[in-house]
């Protein structure tokens, strides 16, 4: 039986005279956007939800600091604080991330330009993006509000997350990473429970992926991501690949399954291996403990262990 052709997503042009999130070419790009969306494999519910979000987004217009009313703080981390806000002109509730940066105007403008790539990242597994702007020393990134919060918040309340739910989390994260990789040549670079968001409709989406190289450099001198979720090759400062995102995803899933971070703190010898420098203190003083699953058996096995991490395409088969 032939596969049913999905219903195309219908997007109406924004009202005359309005700029969509500060980009005057938004209406010109509408046809191209529709074509890209039709390439995605969406079920009917996903299609309708994405269509509704993009239709709302067209009504937002240019984002300005005075147009927001703070409702509550959602969380802080990765160089910024996130607030639940009301966008008064449209009436939409958004999540607004504020990143304080003391940078030159040229760098600031480059960051805003690079963040515009997020306008093209439209997927059921990626948190929606309304726009970004600079005001009073802070970069504002305005996103879809996910009312269920992040999975690290869910984990704190629940203690651990059931296997059945983790299966759905795995599928959503893999599909989100695959979309970023295949459609936009983007690697996430910071997969962890706090960057996986959920909402009351049961959707699971990724946020805070590294699209702006200049923002990454400005925030952390080219060292981005949470160390405890980084793959071994990242800790050593070597190449970054999609396998590094897979490592971080796996570590996050184990943490959510057992209810705690799965790897004990490294001893002095392990720190020396990871960072290539001597650590003060006697490594022999550290009491022996069982090897955590996933850790190398010995230093000689490191290169082989780390180099065989599976590519993301294998998980989608």
Predicted regions and their residues:
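Conserved short submotifs of the Hanks-type protein kinase catalytic core
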Residues: 137-150
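Activation segment signature within eukaryotic-like protein kinase domains
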Residues: 169-170
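Activation-segment/catalytic-loop signature of the eukaryotic protein kinase fold
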Residues: 132
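Intrinsically disordered, low-complexity regulatory segments that flank or precede the catalytic domain
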Residues: 1-61
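Protein kinase glycine-rich loop
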Residues: 71-78, 82
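Conserved N-lobe beta3->alphaC-helix segment of eukaryotic protein kinase catalytic domains
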Residues: 93, 98-121
């Amino acid at each position: 039986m032939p596969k049913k052709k999905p219903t195309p997503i219908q997007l109406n042009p924004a009202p005359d005279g309005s700029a969509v999130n500060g980009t005057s070419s938004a209406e010109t790009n509408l046809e191209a956007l529709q074509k890209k969306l039709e390439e995605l494999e969406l079920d009917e519910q996903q299609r309708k939800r994405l269509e509704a979000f993009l239709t709302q987004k067209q009504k937002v217009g240019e984002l300005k600091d005075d147009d927001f009313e703070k409702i509550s703080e959602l969380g802080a981390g990765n160089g910024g604080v996130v607030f639940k806000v009301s966008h008064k002109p449209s009436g939409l509730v958004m999540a607004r991330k504020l990143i304080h940066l003391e940078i030159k105007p040229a760098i600031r403008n480059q960051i805003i330009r690079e963040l515009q790539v997020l306008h093209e990242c439209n997927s059921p597994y990626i948190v929606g993006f309304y726009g970004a702007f600079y005001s009073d020393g802070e970069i504002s990134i305005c996103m879809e509000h996910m009312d269920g919060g992040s999975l690290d918040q869910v984990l704190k309340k629940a203690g651990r997350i059931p296997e059945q739910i983790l299966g759905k989390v795995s599928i959503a994260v893999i599909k989100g990473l695959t979309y970023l990789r295949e459609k936009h040549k983007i690697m996430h670079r910071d997969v962890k429970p706090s960057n996986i968001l959920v909402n009351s409709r049961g959707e699971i989406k990724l946020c805070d992926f590294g699209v702006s190289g200049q923002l990454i450099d400005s925030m952390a001198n080219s060292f981005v991501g949470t160390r405890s979720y980084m793959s071994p090759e990242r800790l050593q400062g070597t190449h970054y690949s999609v396998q590094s995102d897979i490592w971080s995803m796996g570590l996050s899933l184990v943490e959510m399954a057992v209810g705690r971070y799965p790897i004990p703190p490294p001893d002095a010898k392990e720190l020396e291996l990871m960072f290539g420098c001597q650590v003060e203190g006697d490594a022999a003083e550290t009491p022996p403990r069982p090897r955590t699953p996933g850790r190398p058996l010995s230093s000689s096995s490191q290169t082989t262990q780390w180099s065989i991490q599976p590519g993301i395409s294998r998980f989608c088969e």
